[in-house]
């Protein structure tokens, strides 16, 4: 039928919207243009799918257009002759239709008296309309126009008019050419351009207080418009995923409206791939043919917690993209319904399926197939107990290009502990001179032996030798090297052993062809383990200084007091020496104390005789390097008798020409020369240790004399000297006890020595001492 338009000039209206009871809708656009035309149109529409069937009065609407949207110059408007019942948007992209009736602003009043001009404009608008309906519009602009062109039913009720009256009005206005401006067929009451959207005709009438064209039905809380485009337009939801990764929804769905007004996406059986790759403002379509393979899977229900999810609903097709290639030859593989999510090396996924949260099931509440109603589990997207990463991998170890670094703690715990130097406790570099030592101690020991340095300790020969303080005292460091068993001969012996082994290997290879020949093995191999004598050399105390001032005139009291102070320090050194003797600390602690209390005078007297023998040829008593008792000092009161007993020891050592090894063994036997009458708590072990050092004395004699008949004779002489030491020590102890008890002499005793004498006096007075002699008197 022919649509009729009644356009009458009107006065300038208030820019605000005014509702009137007149027939028709009036739109005023004169606020910006300082003029304008009031359009009063009576329209009858019966076939609009979204129109209401109830009758209501028409209301008047005044709409303001933005400033500058229409030029003030007189220009031909191709859209002014279009029927206002179309609800069609033909203006600029930013203009939105707000009512059923449409008016376009002009500078002057719009008049339809000139029929030819209006008819020509009407024909041009019809041609433009046909072209616009045939060419697909931009999804965004189409959606905006569709939403904007929807008037609210409550504010703008559906208008009814007589068809014949409308035709007569149109003929009266347009003249004879009005019949050529038919926009609809004869059986249509209105021109419906939204019939392709398949809106239900009954839906507007079910809710009388709402309009089917309300934009809030199509706009979510975040003002996201649903792209209501054609069948080939893709739909996309903007989720809360990463900024450069947007969820991709396949173009196998199109919007449909149910009776209740909800939009539904129905899966399409025939999927047509677009032939171009388009990138628009709100979404990105991957449409490269032959690159993306979309597999037909059953539709699933997936509810995601991102904005705009309610505009499409819960029904959508499962996403499965395989082999997405890029221009650089990179490949991606995604499948939400498979059990594995794999990715090639050094690739970044196009979109983010799972937000980076601990549990993926919070965003995917349910997943159910719509075809056979079978539950499809997304177990691969939810790994309990593991951290879910944004790229879909449960942990970095699942990626083929990521290798977990080895744990340093496990390597440190499982590896063998580092070997330490036996001298300074630093990390050992190997076995040097028969002992596991570091390189620094190796060089130090070699220089100390080859250079024949005479190191002296400034302290008490008990300096701490470790990695930091090993250079503080070379004397204690050298003593500790010897105590550990370092020996220059061990290196030479090792070389000899290697030479013997190589020679033996060569001879065995030459004689291996003859089975009668036997492998030549050396009869004796040098002993690499340190001997007891070598250990005794290491633990021998250093020579102590008395600190005697020779510039002051000598006196018996002064010399005796100095000797007591020196004796106290020597006793402390003797205790340390005894504890270092191999086997001594295996004895009971009480036995160790008893042996030291009985033998402390033996040790000091024998050591004094050795120093006197080595330094003064047995003519002088060398107590210390700074305190030597010569013949002049021996003439002092109470000095000669005591010095005479001590000179006997040095003279015997000089007569027998005792070697250093023999001296060390004899000194150790003097430590074990006196025991209580009741015996020791570790008596058997004591006897075994004593016999061991007696044998060591025999070995030292053999080493000095060789295999001769004089070995037994020398052994007799040395053991006879050990027995004579008991008489010498007994005389010295008697004088020491006398001076200790006689307070009138005012001779000072150090604390250590005074304690030993106090414990030893009752034992000597009671006769609770048993002398261990080698020979019977």
Swiss-Prot record:
There is a cross-link at residues 258, 277, 293 (Glycyl lysine isopeptide (Lys-Gly) (interchain with G-Cter in SUMO2)). The modification Phosphoserine is found at residues 45, 113, 134, 141, 203, 211, 226, 267, 404. Residues 532-697 are annotated as: Interaction with CRY1. There is a cross-link at residue 419 (Glycyl lysine isopeptide (Lys-Gly) (interchain with G-Cter in ubiquitin)). Gene3D superfamilies: Erythroid Transcription Factor GATA-1, subunit A, Retinoid X Receptor. Residues 487-523 are annotated as: Hinge. The modification Phosphothreonine is found at residue 8. Acetylation by CLOCK reduces its binding to glucocorticoid response elements and its transcriptional activity. Increased proteasome-mediated degradation in response to glucocorticoids. Residues 421-486 bind DNA. There is a cross-link at residues 277, 293, 703 (Glycyl lysine isopeptide (Lys-Gly) (interchain with G-Cter in SUMO)). Residues 524-758 form the NR LBD domain. GO terms for cellular component: centrosome; chromosome; cytoplasm; mitochondrion; nuclear speck; nucleus; spindle. Residues 134-150, 394-414 have a biased composition (Low complexity). Residues 1-14, 151-163 have a biased composition (Basic and acidic residues). The modification N6-acetyllysine is found at residues 480, 492, 494-495. Residues 485-777 are annotated as: Interaction with CLOCK. The modification Omega-N-methylarginine is found at residue 23. Residues 1-22, 130-183, 394-415 are annotated as: Disordered. A zinc finger (NR C4-type) spans 421-441, 457-481. Heteromultimeric cytoplasmic complex with HSP90AA1, HSPA1A/HSPA1B, and FKBP5 or another immunophilin such as PPID, STIP1, or the immunophilin homolog PPP5C. Upon ligand binding FKBP5 dissociates from the complex and FKBP4 takes its place, thereby linking the complex to dynein and mediating transport to the nucleus, where the complex dissociates. Probably forms a complex composed of chaperones HSP90 and HSP70, co-chaperones CDC37, PPP5C, TSC1 and client protein TSC2, CDK4, AKT, RAF1 and NR3C1; this complex does not contain co-chaperones STIP1/HOP and PTGES3/p23. Directly interacts with UNC45A. Belongs to the nuclear hormone receptor family. NR3 subfamily. Composed of three domains: a modulating N-terminal domain, a DNA-binding domain and a C-terminal ligand-binding domain. The ligand-binding domain is required for correct chromosome segregation during mitosis although ligand binding is not required. Receptor for glucocorticoids (GC). Has a dual mode of action: as a transcription factor that binds to glucocorticoid response elements (GRE), both for nuclear and mitochondrial DNA, and as a modulator of other transcription factors. Affects inflammatory responses, cellular proliferation and differentiation in target tissues. Involved in chromatin remodeling. Plays a role in rapid mRNA degradation by binding to the 5' UTR of target mRNAs and interacting with PNRC2 in a ligand-dependent manner which recruits the RNA helicase UPF1 and the mRNA-decapping enzyme DCP1A, leading to RNA decay. This is Glucocorticoid receptor. The gene is NR3C1.
């Amino acid at each position: 039928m022919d649509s009729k338009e009644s356009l009458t000039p009107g006065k300038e209206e208030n820019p605000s919207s005014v509702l009137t009871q007149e027939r028709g809708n009036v739109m005023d656009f004169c606020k910006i243009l300082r003029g304008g035309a009031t359009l009063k149109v009576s329209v009858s529409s019966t076939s609009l799918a979204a129109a209401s069937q109830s009758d209501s009065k028409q209301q008047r609407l005044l709409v303001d257009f933005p400033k500058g949207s229409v030029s003030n110059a007189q220009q031909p408007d191709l859209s002014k002759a279009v029927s206002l019942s179309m609800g069609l948007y033909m203006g600029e992209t930013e203009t939105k239709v707000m009512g059923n009736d449409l008016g376009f602003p002009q500078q002057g009043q719009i008049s339809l008296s000139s029929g030819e001009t209006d008819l020509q404009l009407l024909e041009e608008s019809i041609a433009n309309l046909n072209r616009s309906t045939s060419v697909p519009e931009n999804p965004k602009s189409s959606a905006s126009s569709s939403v904007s062109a929807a008037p609210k039913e409550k504010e703008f009720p559906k208008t009814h008019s007589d068809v014949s009256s409308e035709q007569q009005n149109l003929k009266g206005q347009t003249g004879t050419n009005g019949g050529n401006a038919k926009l609809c067929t004869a059986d249509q009451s209105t021109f419906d351009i939204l019939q392709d959207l398949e809106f239900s005709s009954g839906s507007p009438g079910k809710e009388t207080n709402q309009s089917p064209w309300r934009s809030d039905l199509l706009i979510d809380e975040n003002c996201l418009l649903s792209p209501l485009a054609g069948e080939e337009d893709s739909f996309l939801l903007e989720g809360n995923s990463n900024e450069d990764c947007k969820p991709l929804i396949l173009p196998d769905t199109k919007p449909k409206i149910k009776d209740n007004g909800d939009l539904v996406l129905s899966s399409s059986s025939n999927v047509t791939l677009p032939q171009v790759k388009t990138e628009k403002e709100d979404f990105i379509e991957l449409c490269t043919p032959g690159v993306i393979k979309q597999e037909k899977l059953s539709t699933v229900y997936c509810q995601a917690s991102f904005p705009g999810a309610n505009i499409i609903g819960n029904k959508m097709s499962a996403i499965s993209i395989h082999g997405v290639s890029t221009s650089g030859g990179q490949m991606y593989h995604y499948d939400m319904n498979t059990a594995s999510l794999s990715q090639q090396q050094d690739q970044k996924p196009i979109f983010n399926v799972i937000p980076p949260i601990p549990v993926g099931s919070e965003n995917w509440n349910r997943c159910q197939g719509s075809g056979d109603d079978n539950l499809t589990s997304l177990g691969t997207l939810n790994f309990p107990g593991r951290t879910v990463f944004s790229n879909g991998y449960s942990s970095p170890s699942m990626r083929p290009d990521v290798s977990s670094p080895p744990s340093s703690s496990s390597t440190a715990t499982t590896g063998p502990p580092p070997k330490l130097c036996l001298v300074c406790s630093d990390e050992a570099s190997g076995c040097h001179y028969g002992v596991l030592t570091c390189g620094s101690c190796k060089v130090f020991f070699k220089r100390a032996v080859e250079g024949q340095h005479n190191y002296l300790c400034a302290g008490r020969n008990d300096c701490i030798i470790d990695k930091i303080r090993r250079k503080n005292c070379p004397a204690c460091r050298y003593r500790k090297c010897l105590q550990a068993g370092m020996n220059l001969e061990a290196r030479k012996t090792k070389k000899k052993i290697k030479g013997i082994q190589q020679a033996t290997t060569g001879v065995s290879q030459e004689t291996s062809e003859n089975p009668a020949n036997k492998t030549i093995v050396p009869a004796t191999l040098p002993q690499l383990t340190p001997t007891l004598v070598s250990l005794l050399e290491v633990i021998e105390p250093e020579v102590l200084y008395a600190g005697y001032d020779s510039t002051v005139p000598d006196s018996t009291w002064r010399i005796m007091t100095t000797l007591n102070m020196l004796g106290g320090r020597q006793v402390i050194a003797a205790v340390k020496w005894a504890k270092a003797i191999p086997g001594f600390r295996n004895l009971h602690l009480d036995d160790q104390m008893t042996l030291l209390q009985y033998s402390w005078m033996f040790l000091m007297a024998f050591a004094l005789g050795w120093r006197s023998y080595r330094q003064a040829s047995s003519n002088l008593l060398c107590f210390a390097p700074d305190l030597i008792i010569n013949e002049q000092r021996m003439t002092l009161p109470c000095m000669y008798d005591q010095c005479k007993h001590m000179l006997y020891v040095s003279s015997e050592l000089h007569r027998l020409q005792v070697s250093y090894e023999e001296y060390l063994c004899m000194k150790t036997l003097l430590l074990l020369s006196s025991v209580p009458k009741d015996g020791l708590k570790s008596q058997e072990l004591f006897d075994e240790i004593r016999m061991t050092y007696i044998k060591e004395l025999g070995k030292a004699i053999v080493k000095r004399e060789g295999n001769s008949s004089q070995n037994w004779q020398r052994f007799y002489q040395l053991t006879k000297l050990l027995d004579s030491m008991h008489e010498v020590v007994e005389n010295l102890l008697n004088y020491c006890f006398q001076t200790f008890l006689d307070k009138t002499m005012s001779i000072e005793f150090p604390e250590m020595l005074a304690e030993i004498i106090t414990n030893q006096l009752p034992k000597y007075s009671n006769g609770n001492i048993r002398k261990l002699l080698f020979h019977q008197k």
